[in-house]
Structures are given as C-alpha cells and as structure tokens.
A protein has these predicted regions:
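A short, conserved beta-strand element in the Rossmann-like catalytic core
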Residues: 44-46
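Hydrophobic helical membrane-anchoring modules
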Residues: 101, 125-203
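Acceptor/aglycone-binding surface of glycosyltransferases and processive sugar-polymer synthases
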Residues: 8-32, 37, 49-132, 159-169, ...
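Acidic helix N-cap motif at the loop->helix transition within catalytic regions
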Residues: 1-2
Length: 203
C-alpha cells in the first residue's frame, strides 16, 4: 500500500464464503468503479504478472471479450506440479470440452481478462458454483451468451510456498457439476450481449 497508495484496494470478508463469491465481489467492485477490463489471477505468482498485458491486449486490441492465460494451448506448460496433478487438470479440461462443447483448451484456468460487458451480462445470481468449478461455469456462461473467447499461452509455475486446496472432493464436485451445468443449460435462455459504446480503461 505504501508503493501503490490509492491504486491498491483490499476487500476483507468474514468467514469462508467460497472462491466464486470472492471473485464476484471483486467483479462488482470493478464494475462499480467503471473499469472496462478486469483481470483475475492467483496472487502467489503461479501466474506471472508480466503476462497480464498480453491478456489485456488480446481483449483491448485483439477483439476478444474474454482472454484466458492457457496452460494447454501449446502443449502442456506447467512447472512444479506432480504428474498426477497435471494429468488430472489436463483430462478435466478434455472432459469439460466433451460434455459442454466449449471450444476452450484450458477450461479450468484462473488467469483471465474480461471485458466489462461480459461481467455485466452474466447474472451472478445464476452462477451456482462457489468452488473451483466456478472457473468452468464463468467460461461456459460467457460462451453461451455469444462472447468471443481467446486463449493466450502462458507458463504456469506452481507456488513456492503454501499448499493447494485442491482435493478429490473438489474434483468430484466439478465432474458432477459439469453434467448438471450442461443439462441445466438446455432449459435456459442465454441472451446475446447488445454492444453499445466501449471506452478504454483497465483494472
């Protein structure tokens, strides 16, 4: 805060309310402050901050509505993960593509840039996942609304300290949840976004 002053905002919440609700609160903050581009990433440097500009440029100048920092668009670019974790993540993305039809290689990625129109269109009340499957549901919902999604290759380096919260329970929840999400989408209408004007500010 001493270095960035008013540019750094810390939002504190009571208790554990889930990963998804934390993201949604951050999105709400960005929309309230009229930012046009909103990025999300892991704060443990698993995601390289130097890649942020590539995601931003893919949206601001490349025509994408959602830019994903992808581990799997050019082979498998993951460092310091055990092989079991790599295989679980890789095949989870294949599973999601097969079930949903979404044309995204890294469906579980958490490194993304959104244009504000995506976050304005997606109703947070209809996002049912609050765990890691939240990442899948946001991409799927954006795609169903007709937004353009692109993937930017990155190298994901696992955290040097701390432990992952990933578990078999979370994985199982995502597997079942993807089926439920796909079935639910058959009975839901996704209104296409109606473009108006676009300005050029970013957060």
């Amino acid at each position: 805060q001493q270095q960035y002053g008013s540019k750094l905002h810390l939002i504190e919440r009571e208790g554990k309310q889930g990963l998804g609700t934390a993201y949604i609160r951050g999105f709400e903050f960005a929309l309230e402050h009229e930012y046009d581009y909103v990025c999300e990433m892991d704060a443990d440097f698993s995601h390289n901050p130097n890649d942020l500009m590539e995601l931003y440029k893919a949206c601001a100048y490349g025509g994408a509505d959602v830019a994903i920092g992808s581990r799997y668009i050019k082979g498998v670019n993951v460092v310091n993960w055990p092989m079991g974790r790599v295989l679980m993540s890789y095949f989870a993305s294949i599973y999601v593509r097969l079930v949903t039809g979404i044309p995204v290689m890294d469906t579980t990625a958490g490194f993304k840039c959104y244009h504000r129109s995506v976050l304005e269109t997606i109703d947070p009340e209809k996002i049912r996942f609050i765990g890691y499957a939240f990442q899948i549901e946001m991409k799927f919902t954006a795609w169903k609304h007709g937004f353009k999604i692109t993937e930017v290759p990155i190298i994901f380096t696992d955290r040097a300290k701390g432990t992952s919260k990933m578990s078999k329970g979370i994985f199982k929840e995502a597997v079942i949840g993807v089926l439920q999400m796909k079935i639910g989408s058959l009975f839901r209408k996704y209104e296409p976004y109606q473009e108006t004007s676009v300005s050029q500010s970013a957060a």
